[in-house]
């Protein structure tokens, strides 16, 4: 089947090139100005085929430089969960642009954004960054100060942004609780010392978690409520229970990174699976693509932030900010907060989330019916509006299981095949997501094109 997938990829890539000549020519010219012809490397790397040049989007669709229309199920890797040009967010952006984008001062929108975030995720106090990477950076710094410790625990298959300390992978041996096995960097350019205070455990392994916490040096346990960068791996109830009971008992903080799950279900995985975090982080789609990251925390941790504001390192006072190393000049800007208020209040509502969940169930059932029709031993799973092609019969429990269920040649062939049929599919390590702008007809269109691909794959 892999050989057949590669054959489909070759054929469909040629067809894709014939449909996108203007994008291709633009990329040739752009290589004189930008590495690989793109302003950010992921725009090539994540697609695993030449990208198109986008010119506009509306609702659940976007158009490229050649005039091709695509039904979007990638949602820009969760940053466009609201859909393109969402009317409430567009109106908020236009209004704020006329008032001023940033003041390096609070604006009135901040209080309402905090209230709306508390409604969804439960935590009472909030700070803002420009990305989820920034949010996780600030959360870890807060955890180190609050606990007086340095070690951070993360899990195989995770992704928490471009933060040096957590761009490492390994598999933890739970048999003796001693760790080991070494770490491998997830990317080039990291400080080799940045992984010195991190351990990578096996997701859903409560015994490994318990053993590592027993060493008494952990500042924070950072996890996604469901793994989303190696397919979709859901947490087992006993794992959730262990995290809730044992992290805090060991003197550490539990940080739940909702960036990829925050709008799949209302309240994200935190509410859906029953996590009880000390800190919640998020970002990406909150403001409809306007840069933002969020850090939610308990009142006690807010007190830690406030209590350290007066810290200074003993040098001549310069008027700079010292305290905990959080913040940034453009963090919590008026534009980001206005867009976030509109998104949280008018787009990502409980009623809308229920509708997206219903569409996600429609997508899951339709894809499973197509898989069963052609006789493949695959399963389709989902979390709310996010579905997952699982190219194995059994549900994955760990990151390693998740990666085993993502067969890249098949994913690559499916992505370019669907693009040629007017559907922009999710990137290989993710699954199709229903945006808040999508309709039942959009979901049915995805299912129909997916069925055509499966017919080709099994021919």
Where are these regions (language model features)?
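Conserved N-terminal phosphate-binding loop of PLP-dependent enzymes in the Aspartate aminotransferase
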Residues: 1-459
């Amino acid at each position: 089947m892999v050989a057949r997938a590669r054959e489909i990829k070759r054929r469909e890539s040629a067809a894709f090139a014939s449909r996108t000549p203007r994008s291709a020519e633009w990329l040739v010219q752009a290589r004189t100005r930008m590495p690989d012809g793109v302003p950010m490397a992921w725009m090539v790397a994540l697609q695993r085929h030449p990208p198109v040049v986008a010119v506009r989007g509306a609702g659940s669709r976007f158009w490229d430089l050649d005039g091709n229309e695509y039904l979007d199920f990638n949602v820009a890797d969760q940053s466009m969960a609201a859909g393109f040009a969402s009317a409430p967010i567009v109106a908020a952006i236009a209004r704020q642009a006329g008032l001023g984008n940033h003041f390096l001062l609070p604006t009135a929108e901040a209080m309402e954004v905090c209230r709306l975030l508390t409604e969804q995720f439960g935590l009472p106090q909030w700070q803002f960054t420009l990305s989820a990477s920034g949010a996780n950076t600030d959360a870890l710094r807060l955890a180190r100060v609050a606990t007086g410790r340095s070690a951070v625990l993360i899990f195989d298959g995770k992704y928490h942004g471009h933060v040096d300390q957590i761009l490492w992978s390994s598999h933890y041996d739970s048999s003796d609780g001693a760790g080991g096995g070494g770490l491998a960097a997830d990317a080039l350019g990291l400080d080799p010392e940045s992984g010195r205070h991190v351990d990578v455990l096996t997701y859903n392994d409560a015994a490994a978690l318990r053993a590592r916490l027993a060493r008494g040096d952990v500042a924070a346990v950072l996890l996604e409520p469901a793994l989303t960068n190696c397919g979709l791996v859901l947490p087992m109830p006993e794992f959730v229970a262990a995290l809730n009971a044992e992290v805090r008992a060991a003197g550490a903080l539990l940080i739940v990174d909702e960036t990829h799950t925050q709008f799949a279900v209302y309240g994200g995985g935190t509410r859906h699976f029953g996590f009880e975090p000390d800190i919640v982080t998020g970002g990406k789609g909150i403001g409809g693509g306007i840069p933002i990251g969020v850090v939610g925390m308990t009142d006690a941790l807010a007190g830690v932030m406030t209590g350290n504001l007066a810290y200074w390192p003993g040098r001549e006072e310069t008027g700079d900010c010292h305290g905990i190393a959080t913040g940034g000049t453009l963090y919590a800007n008026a534009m980001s907060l206005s867009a976030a208020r509109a998104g949280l209040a008018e787009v990502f509502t409980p009623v809308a989330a229920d509708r997206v969940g219903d569409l996600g169930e429609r997508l899951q059932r339709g894809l499973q019916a197509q898989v069963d029709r052609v006789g493949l031993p695959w399963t389709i799973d989902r979390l709310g509006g996010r579905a997952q092609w699982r190219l194995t019969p059994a549900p994955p429990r760990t990151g390693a299981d998740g990666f085993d269920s993502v067969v890249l040649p098949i994913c690559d062939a499916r992505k370019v095949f669907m693009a040629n049929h007017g559907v922009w599919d999710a990137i290989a390590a993710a699954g199709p997501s229903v945006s808040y702008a999508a309709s039942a007809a959009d979901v049915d269109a995805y299912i129909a094109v997916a069925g055509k691909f499966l017919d080709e794959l099994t021919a």
